[in-house]
Structure formats: structure tokens, C-alpha cells
Amino acid sequence: AKAKNKTVQEIKDIITSLHEFNPMMGHRGLRLAVTYPEIAVMQTKAVIRAAINVQKKHPDWKLEPEIMIPLTSEVKEFNVVKKVVVETADEEIKKAGVKLAYQVGTMIEIPRACLTADEIAKNADFFCFGTNDLTQMTFGFSRDDAGKFLNSYYDNKIFESDPFAKLDQVGVGKLMKMAIDLGRPVNPHLHVGICGEHGGDPSSVEFCHNIGLDYVSCSPFRVPVARLAAAQAEIKNPRK
């Protein structure tokens, strides 16, 4: 409240006004940063200051923070938020009198972002597929509510497995491949990964390897499985 020159009650009123009926598809991610750029400023400062502190303590470490802008659906909104991030980061680095490289990329978790990946890739250093939300957005059902009907889908052989546990390679996977095929020609240095529970599923890891992803991330307890699956995928289908 003091930082914004507002009363505590005014801050509480703002928080109350942000209540939504469908927050999954509402005012979140980079939409918040467009409406309240000070949030992006605050978060960027935190990332860069932390990186600078680590760099000072460990000058022998290779450090290059990656700032990921979430929920992009339109290149223009990404560019608006990226401008805030870059200006803030550069100012913090200049004030500290240090040299620090950093990257700014985006989470790809909305189908439209996959369809327009060639535009987004022009200004993004990396893509990270958020397949939990990308699955929700593609199928049009919520991961939190799908349990009410998924068993009936299994019984009727509509689904063979939970699409939130095992990547839907036909639909969601096709969008991912499309995004890579559109993005890399305009940005050959674009590195691409996946985050979400799919990153620990062996068949999903193999699919990610086959379409050209650079890495997968997952929950800590899934890491051994993911590493083994990645090694097996490379043996089965070696990259040049």
C-alpha cells in the first residue's frame, strides 16, 4: 500500500475487484501485466537482482536467467510486456554496474499462440509449452472437473488414457509441432521445451524428442523417469 501511495483498504478493494467467474480463462498471466505493468516490473526486478547477487557470489558460474511471459495469445500483447521486462532488466543491470545476459521468452499454452508462433518467435528467445493449460484449452474442458466424466470416456473407448497425464499427440501434439515448424524458420536460435506433468510421461517425452524439443521439465519425483525416457528416445531415434 505504501509503495503505491494507497490505503490498505484501497488495495483490498482492488483485490476484490479482480474476482472472476472463470479465472482459468480470465484476467491472469500476461493479461495482468498489460493491465498492471507494475507487476511485471516488480517480478523482473526480483529475477534480475537475484541473478546479480548470485553472480557476485559465484563469478565462475555461467548465469543467464530466462524470464518467461505466460499465457501469450497475441504477439502484440507479448511485445508490450516484453518491452516492460527488457527496460526494467536493463535498468537494473546498469544500476548494478555489471554485465548480465538474460533471455525473454513465452509460455505457449493457448492454441492461438501455436497457430501464430511464427509471429511470436520473431521476438521471443524461447518457447515453453505449458501442456497442462494447452490440453485444457484444446479439449475445452477443465483438468479440475474432467474427473466427473473421464471414466465414462474410458468405458466407451473414447479416451484410452487421461489426456492430462499422457500427451494427446494427435491434437495437442499437432499444435506443438505446428508451433515449432512455424517458429524455428524465423528464429533459428529459438530453443523449445515443455513444462507440466507430461514432461514425466515416457511416451510424451519420446514424442517431444521426435518433434524436436530441446528439453522437458517435470515434478521432481518424475525426473528419473523423464531422464530414462529421454535417453531411450535418443537411442531409438538419434538426432543428427
Residue ranges with predicted function:
Residues 1-240:
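Conserved alpha/beta-domain cores
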